[in-house]
């Protein structure tokens, strides 16, 4: 066996600003050509380990290092970020934050210009990588104009063009719709083999990453590595939920049906999965589950009639949409990036005004209501928390809306503390917001709206950046207020797990119109809609098809059984 290209020996790291180590006694070897997934709950040390891999620690994030870490023969404490960047290319969670060129081709060539390469050499390299990454038609575009998947390919080109042999991805699926995420994983797998790369993926969406083969799954918890093995071995041991991670849907379905995972072969690859008598087992389980009648919501809350809007009136993003949301519904709004999901939300909340159409809330026209007046009834939580935060301290941020509305100090304290506990932020209530991770900031903005107790909530990608524990806590809380207060909640999401687990109605946007309005199980088993809306077949759909079950019935019964178990 060849020598490891990455090696940590008894390695620990403590930030200067912290009183305890963030990484504890890390022992890890990664070999050339391996594709490794690093997973773990928020605060487990994944991001810190990533910063060690690309040299940001200890150069940009000073602290105390014990033990040894070597990357491609270089000791991280003795190497510069520049030296390590020659071997390690990093693709960030938000590609926009690493673009430096005005056009795609300029961004691709940036590192070559720094290396003082000749124009013919730069032209040859950019043409080669543009072809490899399917960017030929985008070279003159601004990176900011591109879709999420295209932006990610540009970011990859910018680091691969310098012949980096180690590629580090920080949550590559966070901003992608399901279809783009599936394509991204396929591209990464292809590059691993064709370019002889060593790939490290930091991601908590394990099922989506496992759509392509992974050599090893490394799970972190409390700054330590608690599992390091083949994905199949870890899945068979049912360690996922114990370690704060979401297990694949098909694995949950097998367990619900009473399958002994010890009898399963190729458990990490649904296409190759082998289980004795699995078809009969699944059919028997499906027959034994009786679907309950869904709850009927018949009191209109938000009525939208013939709504049309376009930044260019000749090219409407929202085109003659008519839909009614009822009191007490929990709704998922889905569709390909750029289809108008956020635009529709901005129209509802008054940040944009429609070219035509009407909206009524609780029987009253929204046409003459200001943004503030609408905000008293409709809470809107943006995808990027940094666009909402207006104070420096967590408690003050959550309390701001109540203070502006003249709520008494004692009541402010009571309501803020209650919401902070539900959102998992109570212990941080006196912290500055700048000390929080992206996911923690997200929870602060959700808390700041929930504390106002509006009649309707719109949440844009509410679970982005959340680990399983905080995802479950947040969605359990939203479900509770939905059921107990009959609050209408609309979730703009790419998370198909969320659609199935927590919503009873899915509205699919595409081409300016509503493509489908139905139960999540109906949407996610409709092949035509999946393709049009850039969704992806869930593993439940694939499992049902492979064993001659009605996919819609199977998915609906799985969802019901999961909710009953929860």
Curated annotation (Swiss-Prot):
Residues annotated as binding ATP are 40-47, 335-342
Tell me where the transmembrane regions lie.
none
Q: Which residues form the ABC transporter domain?
A: 6-247, 302-536
Q: Where in the cell is it found?
A: Cell membrane
Q: Does the keyword Zinc apply?
A: no
Q: What class of enzyme is it?
A: translocase
Tell me where it mainly resides. membrane
* Annotated GO CC locations: ATP-binding cassette (ABC) transporter complex
Bilayer topology term = Peripheral membrane protein
Record-listed E.C. numbers: 7.-.-.-
Q: Name one GO molecular function term.
A: ATP hydrolysis activity
Pfam family for this entry, one: DUF3744
Q: Which SUPFAM superfamilies match?
A: P-loop containing nucleoside triphosphate hydrolases
Q: List the disulfide bonds.
A: none
Give the matching InterPro entries. Answer: AAA+_ATPase, ABC_Co_transporter, ABC_transporter-like_ATP-bd, ABC_transporter-like_CS, ABC_transpr_CbiO/EcfA_su, ECF_ABC_transporter_ATP-bd, P-loop_NTPase
Task: Please verify whether the record's keywords include Repeat.
Answer: yes
Ordered alphabetically, the record's keywords are: ATP-binding, Cell membrane, Membrane, Nucleotide-binding, Repeat, Translocase, Transport
Instruction: Specify the superkingdom.
Output: Bacteria
| Similarity section | Belongs to the ABC transporter superfamily.
Biological function? Probably part of an ABC transporter complex. Responsible for energy coupling to the transport system.
Please state what the protein is called.
Putative ABC transporter ATP-binding protein lp_0149
Question: Which species is this record about?
Answer: Lactiplantibacillus plantarum (strain ATCC BAA-793 / NCIMB 8826 / WCFS1)
Q: Lineage from the top down?
A: Bacteria, Bacillati, Bacillota, Bacilli, Lactobacillales
């Amino acid at each position: 066996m060849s020598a490891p290209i990455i090696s940590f020996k008894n390695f620990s790291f403590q930030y200067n600003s912290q009183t305890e180590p963030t990484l504890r006694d890390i022992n890890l070897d990664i070999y050339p050509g391996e594709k490794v997934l690093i997973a773990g709950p928020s605060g487990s040390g994944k991001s810190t380990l990533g910063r060690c891999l690309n040299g940001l620690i200890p150069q940009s994030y000073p602290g105390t290092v014990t033990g040894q870490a070597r990357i491609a023969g270089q000791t991280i404490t003795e190497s510069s970020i520049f030296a390590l960047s020659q071997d390690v290319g990093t693709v960030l969670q938000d590609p926009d934050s690493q673009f430096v060129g005005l056009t795609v081709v300029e961004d691709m060539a940036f590192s070559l210009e720094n290396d003082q390469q000749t124009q013919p050499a730069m032209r040859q390299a950019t043409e080669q990588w543009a072809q490899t990454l399917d960017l030929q038609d985008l070279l003159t575009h601004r990176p900011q104009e591109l879709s999420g998947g295209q932006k990610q390919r540009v970011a990859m080109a910018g680091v691969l063009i310098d012949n980096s042999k180690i590629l580090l991805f920080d949550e590559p699926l966070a901003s992608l719709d399901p279809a783009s995420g599936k394509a991204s994983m396929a591209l990464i797998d292809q590059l691993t083999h064709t370019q002889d790369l060593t790939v490290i993926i930091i991601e908590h969406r394990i099922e989506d990453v496992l759509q392509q083969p992974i050599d090893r799954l490394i799970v972190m918890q409390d700054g330590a590595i608690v599992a390091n093995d083949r994905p199949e071995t870890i899945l068979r041991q049912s360690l996922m939920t114990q370690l704060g991670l979401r297990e694949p849907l098909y694995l949950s379905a097998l367990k619900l049906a009473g399958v002994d995972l010890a009898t399963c072969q190729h458990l990490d690859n649904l296409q190759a999965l082998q289980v004795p008598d699995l078809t009969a087992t699944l059919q028997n389980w499906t027959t034994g589950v009786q679907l309950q009648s869904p709850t009927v919501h018949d009191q209109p809350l938000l009525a939208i009639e013939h709504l049309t809007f376009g930044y260019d009136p000749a090219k409407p993003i929202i085109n003659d949409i008519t839909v009614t949301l009822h009191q007490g519904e929990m709704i998922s709004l889905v569709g390909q990036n750029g289809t108008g999901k956020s635009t529709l939300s901005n129209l509802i909340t008054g940040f944009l005004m429609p070219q035509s159409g009407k909206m009524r809330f609780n029987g009253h026209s929204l046409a003459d209501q200001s943004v503030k007046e609408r905000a008293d009834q409709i809470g809107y939580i943006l995808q990027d928390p940094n666009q909402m935060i207006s104070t420096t301290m967590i408690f003050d941020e959550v309390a701001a809306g109540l203070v502006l509305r003249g709520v008494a100090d004692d009541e402010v304290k009571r309501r803020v503390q209650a919401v902070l506990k539900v959102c998992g932020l109570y212990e941080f209530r006196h912290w500055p917001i700048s000390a929080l991770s992206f996911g923690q900031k997200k929870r602060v903005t959700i808390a700041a709206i929930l504390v106002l107790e509006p009649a309707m909530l719109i949440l844009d990608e509410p679970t982005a950046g959340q680990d399983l524990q905080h995802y479950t806590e947040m969605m359990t809380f939203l479900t509770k207020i939905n059921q107990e207060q009959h609050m209408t909640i609309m979730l703009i999401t790419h998370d198909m797990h969320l659609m199935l687990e927590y919503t009873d109605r899915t509205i699919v946007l595409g081409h300016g119109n509503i493509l489908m309005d139905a139960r999540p199980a109906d949407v996610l088993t409709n092949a035509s809609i999946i393709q049009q809306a850039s969704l992806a077949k869930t593993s439940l759909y694939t499992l049902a098809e492979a064993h001659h079950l009605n996919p819609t019935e199977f998915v609906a019964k799985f969802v019901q059984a999961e909710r009953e178990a929860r």
